[in-house]
Amino acid sequence: MNRILSVTFYLFFIYLYIYETYGKVKNTDKELSDIYGTKYYLRSGFFNSKKCKGHKYEDLQAEGEGENDKEEDSNNEEMNIDEENGLIEGQGESEDPAKASQGGLEDPAKASQGGLEDPAKASQGGLEDPAKASQGGLEDPAKASQGGLEDPAKASQGGLEDPAKASQGGLEDPAKASQGGLEDPAKASQGGLEDPAKASQGGLEDPAKASQGGLEDPAKASQGGLEDPAKASQGGAEGHGKHAPNKENKNKNKESIKNIMNMFI
């Protein structure tokens, strides 16, 4: 008999534990109980403390409202940021065009001086010392005259340490330097052109045009580039008679000058 009582006693406590842990409890909220009915809760122990899944409907609803509030707050923040950006853009567009053309400076004189108030300092590139300004910001006049280089010899050689290399235009190979930087001697003698015929024609592909000094019209070429034959025969002078050049008079003048020079000699 005692054994039966002890077994039933233990079974009763096991039943209570199972009921309290996985028991079926109705929702206490009447409005929600009509909608959702009964819900299972996961409890811990005998004190009905909710754990993990043990949330009431009103708790779930409050959590949902909290999430909605967070979303509204984030949306409001984004709207505020957009409004601030719009105001900044509006201010940038509504600024004075004259001020905008002056780099944001209100004073035109200051804007023309690169933001400097002193005109003399502005003309000296922001330097207070006129001598230093004339020397490109260098304190040593000798160094300034040498392009910022301390060694006069190096300065005279264009910044190159090797005099031979400096005399060759910075090229190490003397042959290449004498050929204008070209490796092919034939190409160098042809002015950088690969075709000898084109090189002999001054870079022109048409031999006839090359023999005419680059002019397409043979008649114009024979007249020294002048379109009027009469003007060409007069050496480019437009006038006739006493204004036209006289070759015989020129030759006579030259001979008389030579005779006078011979007399003095």
Curated annotation (Swiss-Prot):
Keyword Signal listed: yes
Sequence segments annotated as region (Disordered): 59-265
A single Gene Ontology CC term: symbiont-containing vacuole
Keywords, in A-Z order: Malaria, Repeat, Signal
Basic and acidic residues: bias regions: 239-257
Function: S antigens are soluble heat-stable proteins present in the sera of some infected individuals.
Main location: other
Natural source organism: Plasmodium falciparum (isolate FC27 / Papua New Guinea)
Protein localization: Parasitophorous vacuole
Any Pfam family the entry gives: S-antigen
Sequence repeats: from-to residues: 97-107, 108-118, 119-129, 130-140, 141-151, 152-162, 163-173, 174-184, 185-195, 196-206, 207-217, 218-228, 229-239
Signal peptide: 1-23
Highest taxon, organism lineage: Eukaryota
Residue numbers spanned by region 13 X 11 AA approximate tandem repeats of P-A-K-A-S-Q-G-G-L-E-D: 97-239
Protein name: S-antigen protein
InterPro entries in the record: S-antigen
Compositional bias annotation for Acidic residues: 60-86
